[in-house]
Amino acid sequence: MSPLQLNGKSRGTSPGNAEPLPIFDALCRSLPVGTADEQFWWKLTGRHLARMMLEAGYPEHRQVECLLFHRFKVVPTFGPQPQSAEPWYRSRVAASAGDGAPISYSWRFGTADRKPYIRNYIEPLGPLTGTAADPNNDVATRAFLQDLTTTLPNLDLSLFWTFEPHLVSRFSDKADREKYAGPSVLTGVELSPDSDAIEIKMYLYPRIPEQISQLLSTIIPKAMREAYGDDVCLDSLNLVKDFLSNHPDGRQLSPRGTTGIDCCKVQDSRVKFYVATNNTSFDHIATVMTIGGRRPLSTEVLDKLRELWYELNGLPSDFPTSEQVPTDQGQEGPSGHHGVGFYYDIQPRLALPDVKAFINVRKHAKSDLAAAETVIGFLERHGQGHHNPRAYLNVLRDIVPAEELETRVGAQAFYSVAVKKEELDITAYFIPQVYRRFASVQVELNGQRRSRFE
């Protein structure tokens, strides 16, 4: 019998982290085997999740709870295991930074009053995924959400179901269905260490390009009025719309199309509107983060933000803040510099939206390890090392061998940066490398690879 089918006796190895995972291993010995596909995804992503929670210091009972949820609610949605380095269906998870796998991860490093915590991003796959019967992969997602309504008592999908018909296109014409085929909905699964709840986020993406330009002006306001009532306060949304329309820096922002929604009580939920810019000067980034000065940030915070941006890009401290990040003219491919992403966090009860920046590791760092060391060193220097940010390196080494982390980019997708109480709140987004490292993953899961540290 193949090791992939033998639960508890061949659980595979990690590429570079030989430390045991006692809770994961105990569950592997006790849980039902399931299908060969489920075993593949459980052995790979279950181990990753177990490593993340162990390194982040999750209580043992919470580790068990989250692993069981992952095994029985999430893993069965991943569909067939890979048969080659080319995905049978290319998921939109992690967008341009992903390799087509239906899952990615994030690690929030934590702030003075909040511990590190983990989130997974998934796209459920089903028998109709990628076929003419389900060109936008709606069926599997709807089935997954229906299943969650019987499992998660805190789940409230009312805002999502209100927004969904405004943002997800339906096509009656065959030519249009084929033209606009592709995923339109993703799911975020948030696993907080200090809660017994599992929180769900939904991300909607219109397939018709013309819709993207209408999001702020028409589509989102209409959906918000339907959700909250005709008298809903749209001050936060209108502020963002005015900045993008009238401010010189705002006019450089392009909507990306993604709209994020918290699946909790409507009055507590947020609507996240994503944009991007090709301008890499720090002055521009700071202006976008402050919404043209309407959401002021202290000099200390801006200095920290500039320090992090310069270090990730390898810039000297006296590099002019008005200048764009230099691009190696002879350099081709994904490592060239192409700007920064942001989202504006819109809530009817708040007049000012929160802002978060997204820095693409493949475009703004020499290697995955260099980026991680830069972020960790920054946190330690600025008194944010109380949650042991270096534990994140153990997570990366459980996914990718050390020499690949030192010489390549690809394991990490983004770092996001927000401001919380004068601290930079940083989150790392990374991917399991299911297809990009297809051959190595097959060997590792069959337990034939020695540790890279041996």
Curated annotation (Swiss-Prot):
It holds the Pfam family Trp_DMAT. Disulfide bonds: none annotated. Pathway: Secondary metabolite biosynthesis. InterPro entries: Aro_prenylTrfase (IPR033964), Aro_prenylTrfase_DMATS (IPR017795), DMATS-type_fun (IPR012148). CDD domains: PT-DMATS_CymD. GO terms for biological process: alkaloid metabolic process. Its EC number is 2.5.1.-. One of its GO terms (molecular function) is prenyltransferase activity. Keywords: Transferase. Prenyltransferase; part of the gene cluster that mediates the biosynthesis of neosartoricin, a prenylated anthracenone that exhibits T-cell antiproliferative activity, suggestive of a physiological role as an immunosuppressive agent. The non-reducing polyketide synthase nscA probably synthesizes and cyclizes the decaketide backbone. The hydrolase nscB then mediates the product release through hydrolysis followed by spontaneous decarboxylation. The prenyltransferase nscD catalyzes the addition of the dimethylallyl group to the aromatic C5. Belongs to the tryptophan dimethylallyltransferase family. This is Prenyltransferase nscD.
